[in-house]
Amino acid sequence: MSEINISAAAVKELREKTGAGMMDCKKALIETSGNFEEAIDFLRKKGLAAAAKKAGRIASEGLTAAKVDGLTGVVVEVNSETDFVARNEQFQDLVKDIANLAVIAKTIDTLKTSKMQSGKSVEEEIIENIATIGENLTLRRMDILEISEGAIGSYVHNEVVPNLGKISVLVGLESNAKDKTKLEALAKQVAVHVAGNNPQSIDDSSLDQALVERERKVFFEKSKEEGKPDNIIEKMVEGRIRKFFSEVVLLQQNFLFEPKLTVAEVIKNAEKELGAEIKIAKFIRYELGEGIEHEEKNFADEVAAITQG
């Protein structure tokens, strides 16, 4: 079959529509004699056949999403291989739909088998999107926050569209305060604080004790090397542990919006103002790709690979 002329504009449009690679889009248009809809189907079929291969590739980009429905909130992370796909409207819609279902599903196993509007399960829908988008996609994780009364604050940092971005945070404030507007505003502020300060726990008692002991050991050895007497070393270590707590424990951190006050002091002031007890029940902070090994690529090599052939 002689190769027909395919315009760069057609290739670009198909890539924007499907998220598939430039060369894949060009080949699809050639194989379908330039028929746009048939080219989309060609990519879908080709992608489904190659889904198993794509599943072996590292997916560390993508999006996190936060969704609040009354007294329930969820955060999900769906990964892709490239940031380019995260800007693809089809992928964004997929993540939004998954987050909406997560509120009802409550666990990731239930979520994976939940039916989407298409009638397919979330897992099946992801496989189909691997076909059209042309990258490995994975539903990596989800977490749920539920409170009996109060307010849930949500914040998404580096949003690409509303509620989708690089960092998603939920904060649940348990309270019977009557002024829900002020309580919700406080929950939102604490969520922004959590995004920026990345606390490891709500209070020191819930902090991983293995982490505390590791820090204590490091501080002890450092103080010992400085040649201090044992009684001084003990005081120095305790002082450094207190400083460590102020850096990683939410209630002891200086509040982002009022740096002279700790989060605990801000909560106490709000309790006085609203005339009700306020408790931080839970927070969730997802940062895209945290803990995933990233594959290092040379940009020049990537461009060369795309333009070859």
Curated annotation (Swiss-Prot):
Keyword Nucleotide-binding: no
Keywords tagged on the record: Cytoplasm, Elongation factor, Protein biosynthesis
PROSITE patterns, per the entry: EF_TS_1 (PS01126), EF_TS_2 (PS01127)
UniProt region (Involved in Mg(2+) ion dislocation from EF-Tu), positions on chain: 82-85
GO terms, molecular function: translation elongation factor activity
Compartment(s): Cytoplasm
GO CC aspect terms: cytoplasm
Primary subcellular site in the record, as a coarse category: cytoplasm
Database matches in Pfam families: EF_TS
Keyword Cytoplasm (UniProt): yes
HAMAP family, alphabetized: EF_Ts
PANTHER family: ELONGATION FACTOR TS (PTHR11741), ELONGATION FACTOR TS, MITOCHONDRIAL (PTHR11741:SF0)
Family in the record: Belongs to the EF-Ts family.
Record's function text: Associates with the EF-Tu.GDP complex and induces the exchange of GDP to GTP. It remains bound to the aminoacyl-tRNA.EF-Tu.GTP complex up to the GTP hydrolysis stage on the ribosome.
Protein name: Elongation factor Ts
